[in-house]
């Protein structure tokens, strides 16, 4: 039985396009990208127009695929507001491969500069900018033939991509996302972070980033780190520090300056390292890998390595707590990115869609003055597809908690 045909995208399904008016001039600088290779001069879909169409896809659930995006481009109001003509499926597919995704970074930087910081814990006011670092896997369903070939070779029908994300805690938004195939070497999450380090940042990471060479790179870049390390880490105590009442109340059970990499000292940290032990609720993490029983039961103690030797122990624990903000963000971001359907399966196309999703996050924050949440994003989508009025959107925003500092 044939699948049910999707309804055509109609003019009344696409509203709220006036909000794209501010964005169009910002993207205009991209207009001539990749035009030099078009010797015949017959390009009809330009980079700025392609990005605006992707943003329309991200904000309008009615536009749910490449084909419906092509249909939307035929609407007179879409063409007027986005400054584009009718886009064929072929031109949309080509655009994902010829335009330079890195050029969207400057757009992201400019929009980020317009954001004001959200609420920050006053206890963290003396800590340099907090950046939570993590990666998430993005499963892209390839075309039927590609999937069949892949299954013959590896027994798998999925292609995995990893989003290496640096998330600015204070403003509640990603400052950088790098897209790589899932794997080691140059695509390893630690290698990607080492290539993109900045000064005056406190990087907050989980156990996947436990690597002494990376710790040294962070310090050499003029930044700091708070990294949860493995439970079985070996160390030699250099200094045992007393636990204050404030630290004990925060769950800190031990605070020591240590020497690491005892078997291979030359491969260890080249700076003073401190371990702060924080008691939490024990849990057991199961592994989904075949033949792997997982990391076993946890003793409920977080072991946090840091080069911040003069910061109170309870603040080290508080800094690590901020890492969970990136986990919450990923739930929202996967929904926003359209993980239900990737518009392109090429790395270039995925990067463009990812950067456009970051721009969408920034727009939600700029339009609403709030941290982008799933509920607010859904309300904006209802407005864009005509299910909610502007008054109802404003009423929703007025009910949100204040974000004043």
Model-derived segments and their meaning:
Residues 1-68, 85, 96-99, 106-110, ...:
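Single, function-defining residue in the core of a domain
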Residues 42, 75-93:
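Short, basic interhelical loop/turn and adjoining N-cap
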Residues 71:
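Alpha-helical residues within the helix-turn-helix
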Residues 113-120:
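A short, well-structured juxtamembrane/interface segment
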Residues 149-151:
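Conserved mixed alpha/beta core segments that line enzyme active sites in large multi-domain catalysts
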């Amino acid at each position: 039985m044939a699948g049910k045909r999707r309804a055509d995208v109609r003019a009344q399904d696409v509203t709220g396009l006036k909000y794209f008016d501010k964005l169009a001039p910002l993207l205009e600088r991209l207009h001539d990208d990749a035009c030099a290779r078009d010797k015949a001069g017959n390009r009809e879909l330009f980079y700025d127009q392609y990005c605006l169409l992707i943003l329309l896809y991200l904000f309008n659930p009615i536009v749910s695929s490449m084909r419906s995006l092509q249909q939307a481009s035929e609407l007179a109001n879409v063409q007027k507001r986005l400054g584009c003509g009718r886009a064929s499926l072929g031109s949309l597919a080509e655009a994902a491969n010829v335009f330079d995704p890195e050029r969207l970074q400057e757009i992201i930087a400019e929009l980020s500069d317009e954001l004001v910081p959200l609420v920050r814990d006053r206890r963290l006011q003396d800590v340099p900018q907090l950046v939570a670092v993590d990666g998430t896997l993005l499963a892209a369903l390839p075309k039927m033939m590609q999937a069949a070939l892949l299954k013959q070779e590896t027994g798998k029908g999925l292609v995995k991509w990893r989003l290496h994300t640096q998330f600015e805690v204070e403003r509640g938004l990603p400052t950088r996302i790098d897209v790589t195939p899932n794997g080691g070497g140059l695509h390893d999450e630690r290698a990607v972070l080492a290539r993109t380090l900045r000064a005056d940042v406190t990087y907050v990471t989980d156990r996947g980033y436990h690597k002494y060479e990376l710790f040294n790179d962070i310090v050499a870049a003029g930044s700091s780190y708070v990294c949860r390390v493995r439970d079985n880490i070996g160390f030699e105590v250099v200094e045992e520090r007393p636990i204050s009442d404030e630290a004990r109340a925060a769950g800190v059970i031990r605070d020591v300056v240590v020497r690491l990499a005892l078997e291979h000292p030359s491969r260890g940290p080249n700076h003073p390292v401190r371990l702060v032990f924080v008691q939490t609720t024990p849990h057991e993490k199961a592994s989904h890998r075949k033949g792997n029983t997982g990391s076993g039961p946890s003793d409920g103690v977080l072991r946090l390595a840091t080069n911040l030797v003069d910061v109170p122990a309870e603040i080290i624990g508080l800094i690590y707590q901020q890492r969970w903000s990136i986990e919450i963000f990923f739930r929202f971001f996967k929904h926003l990115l359209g993980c239900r359907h990737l518009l392109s399966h090429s790395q270039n196309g995925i990067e463009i869609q990812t950067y456009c999703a970051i721009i969408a996050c920034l727009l939600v924050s700029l339009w609403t003055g709030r941290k982008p949440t799933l509920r607010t994003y859904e309300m904006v989508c209802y407005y864009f597809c005509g299910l909610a009025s502007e008054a109802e959107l404003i009423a929703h925003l007025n009910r949100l908690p204040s974000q004043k500092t």
